[in-house]
């Protein structure tokens, strides 16, 4: 194979994937952008060919939408933080295990992904409801019942359960690339286990923590099933708000505008977080 032909080969092989991505991602995104600028009439619906900025102005000028944006992002940030705190030690323990226990533990970590998110949401609603298992346990001690369903607590707990595997796997992958002799050398030179973990291990698994946190935050901010089933009608997040605009209010242009603003805000937060962590990672490694 000549050199120019060999240089073109990777592009030729990736062309089907690029076309598929363009058809399934870029085309719908472009149509959503166009829809978000269409004039909406309550009687006839979106007016193709008539464009306006009113939908974006309605979102950025109404405190109601700011409150929902804020709720979405603080819940997503809290879920990401909890997943880091729980998932990083879990990945470390998984990495230190030997066969066959490692395979069993890995199956336990991945098992939630084999069950539908809707089924898991219904399971949590049965646990957290007024007559659920948790309130039943409190009642056995003469306390409660406590309102847990349709609260931020229910949404956070269920999202952590759903998103935790997306944190464990990237961190575990980074730990597998870690040379254990480096940490052992630090211990032999007098460093405490905590110091070796903080100065040697954590900086090297930072890429895994970064990728895991970006996945968890992005999926949490755009999650629909968990907030919809465990948050109820009053505890709205951005995905449930978009759903209401599309299917209840039938205001598709406003729903499209909210979806694009959510996408833009998500990208800003994730790129900012990525930049901050990369700087700390480079600084830690010198």
Predicted regions and their residues:
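The alpha-helix within a helix-turn-helix
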Residues: 186
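Short, Lys/Arg-rich, polar N-terminal cytosolic tail immediately upstream
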Residues: 1-7
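Short cytosolic juxtamembrane segments of multi-pass membrane proteins
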Residues: 276-286
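Short coil/turn motifs that cap or connect alpha-helices
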Residues: 144, 191-193
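Membrane-water interface segments at the C-terminal ends of transmembrane alpha-helices
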Residues: 9-42, 57-176, 200-224, 229-231, ...
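Glycine/proline-centered hinge or cleavage motifs at structural transition points of membrane proteins
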Residues: 189-190, 203
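Short glycine/proline-centered loop/turn elements that form peptide/ligand docking sites
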Residues: 178-182, 281-282
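Glycine-rich helix-loop "coupling/hinge" segments at transmembrane-helix boundaries
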Residues: 44-49, 126, 224-250, 286
């Amino acid at each position: 194979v000549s050199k120019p032909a060999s240089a073109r080969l990777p592009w030729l092989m990736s062309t089907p994937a690029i076309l598929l991505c363009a058809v399934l991602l870029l085309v719908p995104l472009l149509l959503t952008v166009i829809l978000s600028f269409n004039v909406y009439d309550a009687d006839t619906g979106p007016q193709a060919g008539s464009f306006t900025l009113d939908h974006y102005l309605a979102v950025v000028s109404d405190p109601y939408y700011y409150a929902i944006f804020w709720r979405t992002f603080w819940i997503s940030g809290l879920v990401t933080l909890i997943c880091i705190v729980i998932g990083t030690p879990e990945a470390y323990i998984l990495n230190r295990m030997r066969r066959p226990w490692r395979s069993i533990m890995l199956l336990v970590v991945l098992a939630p992904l084999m069950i539908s998110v809707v089924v898991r949401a219904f399971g949590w609603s049965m646990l957290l409801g007024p007559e659920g298992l948790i309130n039943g346990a409190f009642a056995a001690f003469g306390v409660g019942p406590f309102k847990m369903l349709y609260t931020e607590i229910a949404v956070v707990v269920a999202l952590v359960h759903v998103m935790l595997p997306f944190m464990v796997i990237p961190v575990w992958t980074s730990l597998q690339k870690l040379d254990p002799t480096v940490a052992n050398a630090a211990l032999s030179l007098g460093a405490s286990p905590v110091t070796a973990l903080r100065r040697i291990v954590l900086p090297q698994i930072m890429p895994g923590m970064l990728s895991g946190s970006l996945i968890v935050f992005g999926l949490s901010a755009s999650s629909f099933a968990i907030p919809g089933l465990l948050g109820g009608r009053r505890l709205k997040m951005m995905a449930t708000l978009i759903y209401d605009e599309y299917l209840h209010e039938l205001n598709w242009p406003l729903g499209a505008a909210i979806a694009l603003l959510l996408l833009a805000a998500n990208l800003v937060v994730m790129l900012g977080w990525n930049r901050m962590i990369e700087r700390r990672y480079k600084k830690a490694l010198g």
